Structures are given as C-alpha cells and as structure tokens.
C-alpha cells in the first residue's frame, strides 16, 4: 500500500510524521526507544489496538494521551503499510536529588514539597514541574523577606538515561526598611499613622535590638489597618491611591512611600431597617445602637451586623443576608444607612453525628449536647456543646460542621469531629527513705472507663511508716439531668515519726460520697456525706504542744475517733481547655463540718480560684492569677484535729520551698538537740523539720505564661512555660508564743504574719503518662529555718 501523506504534529516542541489516510486497518504496532516504560503501559494510553480501524484523529489523541503521562520527551509515529511504528524518546529517570545553601528550609521539607509536585527519585524528569518548583520557592522566600534569593537547578544526565538534580539555593539577606513616607495625611501626624504599622523604620527606645525588616505581606496588613483607622474616624471616602516600594542600590534597604487621600468626615443622619423580619424586627432594631449625627464608624457597623447575624443564627436562620446600602448627602456630609436584611430559610437540626470517637460511646458525647435533634438550629447551643466536650479530659481538637440537607426541606445535620486523648495511666514507684525504709507505690486511673465516661482511680502505698489504699469512682451522669455521683473508699495506716522525738500511729478508714448538681453550663453544686474512723496511738510522750503545755495531747495515747461530715461545694468553670487553659475562670468554694454523732466538732472552708487572661489575640501570652485560701476551727474550745490541718504540699506549696516545711512546727524538749531546727545553746527547745500544718492558709500565684522560643506550633499544645511569683503561708490562729518566753526564737504563726514568697520559672509538659511540671525558684521572703529546694518536679495538673 502506497504512502499517501506524511503529517507532522508539534506538541510542545515534539514532532510526529504520519502518512495520512482517512481510515485504515492496523495489523502491527511497534515501539522503538522504550527502556523504563513498558510496551503494555503504552498500549493502555493509546486509542487503538491491532485489527482496529484507525484515523488521523486516533493517532493525534493517542499522542496527546502519551504526552499527558509526563514520561516522554519526543514521540514520532511512522505509518508504513499496515504497521504503526512509535519512535519514542523517554524522559530521564530522576536518580538523585541534593540540596545546598538552604538554611531556612530543611532538606526534608524541600523533598516533601518536590514529592507533592511529582519530582522524586524514580520518577521521570519533567522540566515544567522544575519551573513550578523554582517559581513557588522564590515566592516563599519573598514572603519571608528574602527578596533577592536565587534558585538554580543543575542537571547531570548519565549514559543510562538517568539524571541527578543538584539544587543550589542562595538565601538572600533580609531587606531593612530605610524610611517610610506618608503623603496626603492632613488630619493625623506621621507618628500617629506609623504607630498603626508593625513595620518600622526606626527602633523603639525600649527594644534597641529589634530589626526593621520589610515584608510585603505585613505591609498589606498595615495598609489595611490604616484604612480601617480612618474609616472608624468617619472618613468614609478615605483611599490609599498607591504604594511605592523602592529598593536602594545595594538591594539590602528599601524606601516605602504610601499615597493617601483622607477626604472629609461623614456623619450618620439616620438608619432604616428593611426586610421581612417577622417578630424579630424590634429585637434587631435594638442592636443598631447608632445615634443621629454620630460619625461613621466601620468597626461599629461591622459589629452590629455580626450581632444581628448571631441573633438570627440562634433562632434557626443559618445564613441571613445583610446588605448595608448607604445614601450619601455630599453637600451636608451625611449618610443614611439602609440595613436590608433577608433572613432566608429557617432550619431545624435533623441529626447530630460524632466523628473520631473510637473508644468513647456515643451516649457519652450525646449527653453533653445542648442542641436537641428536631428543634430549631441554635448556634449558641451548638457552641456550648463544644465547650462541654472540651471539659471532658479525654477529648481534644473538637470542631463542628453543619451540612444542609437537600433531600429534607429546611433540615441540617451537625457533625462534631474530635480526637480522643489517652485516658488511662498506670504508675509504679520504688524508693528508699531513712525513716520509711523501702517504699513501694502504685496507682491506676482511667478517666473514660470502657468508653462510658466514668472515672476510676485506685492507688496503694507500702513502706515502714505507711500502708495506704484508696479507690474512687465517678459517674458523671448518675441521673440523666447531669447529676454526678462520686464515691471514694480509703484506708491509711501512718506512723508520724520526727527525729525519734515521738511516734503517732494513725489508722484511718472511711468513705465519702457526693452528688453534684448541674445548675447551668458553667456552675455546679455538690453536696455529700463522709465518714472517717480514726484510730490514734501515741507511743512517746516526749513532746510539747505549740502552746508549751507538756503532754497536752495525751488524749492521743489511745484514742478512737469517729467523724461524720457534711460536705458541700460550688464550682464555677469557664476555662477554655482542661489542660493548658488559655482563657476563663475556675472557682471552687467548698466546706465541710461535723454533724451530730461525731466525736469531734469542727468546720473547714476552702476557696480556690484561678483566672486566665489572654494578653493578645493569639493567646500565646497569658496572665494567670491563682489563689487558695482556707480556714478551719473547732466548734468548741478544742483545736482543729491535727489530721484536718492544711499543709503546704502539691498545689498548696510555694515553689522553692521543700514540700510540707512551710507553716507551724512542733516544738520539743530533748537532750538530743542537734536533731532539731532552730537549736541554740541558750534554749532547750527546738522545732520539727516538717510542718504539722495549720488551721488557716493563703497561697497565691501570679504567672506570666509565655510561648517557648524555637518550639514549633504543633508542639506548643504539649509544652508551656511561665514566670511566676508565689506567696503565702500556713498559720495557726490559736498560736500565742507570748505565753512562753522560751518560744521567742521561733517564727510567729499568727494570721497574716510571716509571709513566704519566691520567684522563678516553670515548664509543664503534657507527656504520655500525664502532666509533668518542672520549676526552678528563688525564695525572696523566708525565715532562717526554712527548708529550701530550688529545683522541683511534680506529676499532675499545675496550670
């Protein structure tokens, strides 16, 4: 068969020769030049097979399909008789990719981006993708202020059609701002305008180390802030005509010139509310707090629109349209605002779904919902659902999405997406102490037991001085309305032994059970009952009480004490996140007192409040205030039982002081005086190392929580640092050292006297085994007998 026509197809810079014929039958297909791309893969990308009737269009489409694979450099097709021959030149295979010169971006980040583009080892080399990579990388460097950066890619092709890519990156220096000039400002001085900019052309006196670098994106943000400033002052026709950025000859400095037109100030003479607003007309009108002859304020009007949208979203109107149409009186410089509102459809919630809860049962999440299925959509209730879920310790990263249903009129589905946190801890400890000997402890806790939302905690301690065990369980929805039941059973056999002066063996067992009632989303009331059986045995009488009367605690020699207590508390909680809160308040007020049938008669009250105040919009810098105050006393002439005293341990401690060494001490007389604190040869008295606690307490913490330098954003969820000031003490309000002149050498624990304080830094890590807290403190107020401990480590929630 004669060759009638030869046609050439150019696609990009490739050519194809084909002898044309309208339609003919192919009996053979041959391929030349294939090395890494198989014949079968080519056949999958062409539009004909052996025996097919083909046309010129079939060949054109086949060539286009093959080029779209990105694996061929040239494709030439020759038609000879009933044979089609593909003469193909493959693109080289990428063998190796190396980088040099990159300091800002790691090799791994660059390789990841190249892989996303399709440029990786083992892939065919595509020059177009290289161009895209260079363009985008230069754009990135420009966005971070490296405007003169350069990227070059050198290619080395081997004989086996493989290619090595060597990417050389020149990261230019940051460009310093030489001068910022504002032209057209008649009503506000340059200094006032530049105070709105984050870009600066001069250093602040208080921060002489700061740099004045130019970033194009920051300039756009600054100009937007400038525009908003004028619009909020009434300059309705304020305009930024243009900006001019001129690089100086050395290209390391830049001059910025901004041309503005301020215009005249406009007042609002009136406003009108238009639209089918049904029964909401008056409520919406009340949001528009604009007075006649008030200067135009864009920020205020934007806030009004947001309030109206929020109001309607709580009534079921998901997407109301609010358009403000101004009528301008140029002569009088006045504006009439027309609020044109279309509330559109009203939606009901069809179904609430949860995504991400692999362990947690659906009912556990659903009972936290404030929005009810089948009722009108209410954005406020949906957001309260997020806050309720955030208060569960075992959940994080909670978001919500809505999906409008097209198959159900006015219906919308709500989906909460969440991430489950580790819910259980199992700890074992082994230690040795001079007095306690070998010590073993173990604990287990589960905040989401079998996905039920219930909490279970148990712990044991065993050493020469103590045998301790307790178990507690909390059912957060004991009654469907959100009533919690918390029950704890405990046993403690402890020998108080201080420097061989005395031993007290105290055996305690009992239980506590509380019911917690939900008042609203942020407040809860607890009321409960407790029973404690105390067995006290005094083995030594060589000690004095704090008022100096010898053996005044003789009743401890053999004593069985049963206490029945009424427990009550009020909790207010608006914290954003349980661990690492960023805003809000948590206040806990509790009390307990004995009831008839108890061997003791006493009361105790505790006030615990912490407030997190974000100092900037991103909530990276947070000011924390925390105060714990307590008071307790006997209801008769007796003292508060010593085992009910407040102690400086755990969250009560002042950092920098050893735990349980702050506050009243026991005072002794003994021949072995060197073992006591405060010993001097002129006195036969000394005090114990550890505190016996007191009936009054005030501990306050002031902290500035700051981001940790050089820590990536994703790690900031698990790490937090702060600078702190701790102050306070433990007191005994019945302490009176004037009763005995020999006690003058010891600190006075009268209320509000003898304050202890420290300053320092702290680091908290939310580790896989729970929160770990490290602190380093320096005491600024102390007494000579204080036991100091600069570096401290704690396990548990701190702030």
Swiss-Prot record:
Q: Under the cellular component aspect of Gene Ontology, which terms does the record hold?
A: Bam protein complex
Q: Write out the similarity annotation.
A: Belongs to the BamA family.
Q: Which GO terms describe its biological process?
A: Gram-negative-bacterium-type cell outer membrane assembly; protein insertion into membrane
Q: Give the POTRA domain ranges.
A: 24-91, 92-172, 175-263, 266-344, 347-421
Pfam families of this UniProt entry?
Answer: Omp85, POTRA
Name the species this protein comes from. Buchnera aphidicola subsp. Schizaphis graminum (strain Sg)
UniProt subunit comment = Part of the Bam complex.
Signal sequence: where? 1-20
Keyword annotations for this protein, in alphabetical order, are: Cell outer membrane, Membrane, Repeat, Signal, Transmembrane, Transmembrane beta strand
Q: Give its localization.
A: Cell outer membrane
Show the stretches that span the lipid bilayer.
Answer: none
The superkingdom listed in its UniProt entry is: Bacteria
Report the protein name in the record.
Answer: Outer membrane protein assembly factor BamA
The answer, when asked if Ribosomal protein is one of the entry's keywords, is: no
Q: What does this protein do?
A: Part of the outer membrane protein assembly complex, which is involved in assembly and insertion of beta-barrel proteins into the outer membrane.
């Amino acid at each position: 068969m004669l060759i009638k026509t030869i046609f050439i197809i150019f696609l990009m810079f490739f050519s194809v020769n084909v002898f044309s014929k309208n339609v003919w039958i192919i009996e053979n297909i041959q391929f030349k030049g294939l090395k890494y791309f198989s014949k079968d893969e080519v056949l999958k990308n062409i539009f004909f097979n052996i025996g097919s009737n083909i046309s010129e269009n079939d060949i054109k489409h086949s060539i286009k399909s093959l080029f779209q694979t990105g694996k061929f450099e040239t494709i030439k097709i020759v038609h000879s008789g009933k044979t089609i021959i593909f003469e193909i030149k493959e693109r080289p295979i990428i063998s190796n990719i190396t980088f040099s010169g990159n300091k800002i971006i790691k090799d791994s980040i660059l390789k990841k981006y190249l892989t996303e583009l399709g440029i990786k080892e083992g892939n065919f080399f595509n020059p177009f993708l290289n161009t895209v990579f260079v363009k985008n990388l230069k754009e990135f460097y420009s966005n971070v202020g490296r405007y003169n950066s350069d990227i070059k890619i050198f290619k080395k092709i081997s004989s086996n059609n493989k290619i090595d890519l060597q990417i050389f990156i020149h990261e230019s220096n940051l460009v310093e701002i030489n001068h910022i000039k504002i032209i057209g400002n008649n009503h506000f001085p340059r200094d006032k305008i530049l105070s709105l900019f984050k870009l600066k052309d001069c250093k602040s006196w208080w921060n002489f180390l700061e740099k004045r670098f130019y970033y194009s994106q920051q300039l756009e943000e600054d100009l937007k802030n400038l525009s908003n400033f004028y619009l909020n002052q009434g300059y309705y026709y304020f305009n930024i005509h243009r900006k001019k950025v001129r690089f100086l000859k050395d290209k390391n400095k830049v001059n910025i010139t901004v041309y503005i037109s301020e215009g005249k100030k406009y007042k609002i003479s009136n406003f009108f509310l238009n639209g089918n607003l049904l029964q909401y007309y008056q409520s919406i009108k009340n949001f528009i707090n604009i007075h006649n002859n008030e200067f135009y304020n864009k920020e205020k009007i934007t806030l009004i629109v947001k309030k109206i949208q929020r109001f309607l979203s709580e009534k079921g109107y998901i997407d109301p349209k609010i358009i403000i149409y101004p009528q301008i009186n140029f002569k009088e410089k006045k504006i009439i605002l027309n609020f044109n509102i279309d509330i559109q459809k009203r939606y009901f919630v069809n179904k609430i779904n949860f995504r991400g809860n692999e362990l947690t049962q659906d009912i556990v999440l659903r009972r936290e919902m404030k929005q009810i299925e089948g009722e009108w959509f209410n954005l406020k209730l949906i957001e309260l659902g997020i806050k309720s879920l955030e208060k569960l310790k075992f959940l994080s990263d909670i978001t919500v999405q809505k999906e409008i249903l097209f198959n159900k009129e006015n219906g919308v589905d709500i989906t909460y997406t969440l991430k489950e946190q580790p819910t259980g801890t199992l700890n074992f400890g082994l230690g040795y102490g001079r007095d306690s000997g070998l010590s073993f402890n173990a604990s287990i806790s589960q905040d989401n037991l079998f996905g039920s939302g219930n909490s279970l905690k148990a712990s044991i301690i065993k050493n020469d001085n103590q045998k301790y065990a307790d178990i507690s369980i909390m059912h957060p929805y004991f009654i469907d309305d959100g009533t919690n039941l918390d029950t704890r059973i405990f046993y403690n056999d402890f020998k108080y032994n201080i420097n061989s002066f005395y031993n007290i063996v105290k055996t305690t067992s009992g239980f506590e059970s509380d019911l917690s009632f939900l008042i609203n989303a942020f407040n809860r009331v607890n009321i409960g009952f407790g029973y404690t059986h105390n067995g006290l045995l005094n083995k030594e009488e060589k000690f004095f009480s704090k008022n100096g009367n010898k053996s005044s605690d003789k009743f401890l020699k053999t004593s069985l004490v049963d206490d029945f207590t009424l427990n009550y508390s009020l909790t207010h909680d608006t914290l954003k996140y349980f661990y690492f809160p960023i805003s809000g308040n948590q206040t806990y007020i509790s009390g307990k007192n004995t009831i008839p049938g108890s061997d003791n008669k006493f009361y105790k009250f505790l006030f615990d409040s912490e407030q997190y105040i974000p100092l900037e919009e991103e909530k990276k810098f947070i000011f924390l205030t925390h105060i714990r105050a307590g008071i307790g006393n006997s209801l008769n002439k007796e003292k508060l039982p010593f085992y009910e005293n407040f102690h400086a341990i755990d969250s009560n401690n002042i950092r920098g002081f050893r735990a349980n060494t702050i506050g009243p001490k026991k005072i002794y007389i003994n021949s072995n005086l060197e073992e006591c604190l405060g010993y001097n040869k002129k006195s036969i008295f000394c005090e114990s190392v550890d505190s016996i606690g007191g009936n009054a307490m005030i501990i306050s913490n002031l902290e500035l929580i700051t981001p940790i330098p050089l820590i990536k954003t994703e790690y900031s969820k698990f790490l937090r640092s702060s600078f702190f000031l701790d102050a306070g003490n433990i007191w005994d309000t019945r302490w009176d050292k004037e009763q005995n002149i020999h006690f003058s050498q010891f600190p006075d624990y009268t209320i509000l006297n003898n304050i202890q304080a420290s300053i320092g830094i702290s680091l908290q890590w939310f580790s896989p085994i729970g929160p770990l807290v490290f602190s380093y403190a320096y005491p600024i107020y102390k007494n000579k007998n204080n036991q100091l401990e600069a570096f401290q480590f704690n396990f548990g929630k701190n702030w």
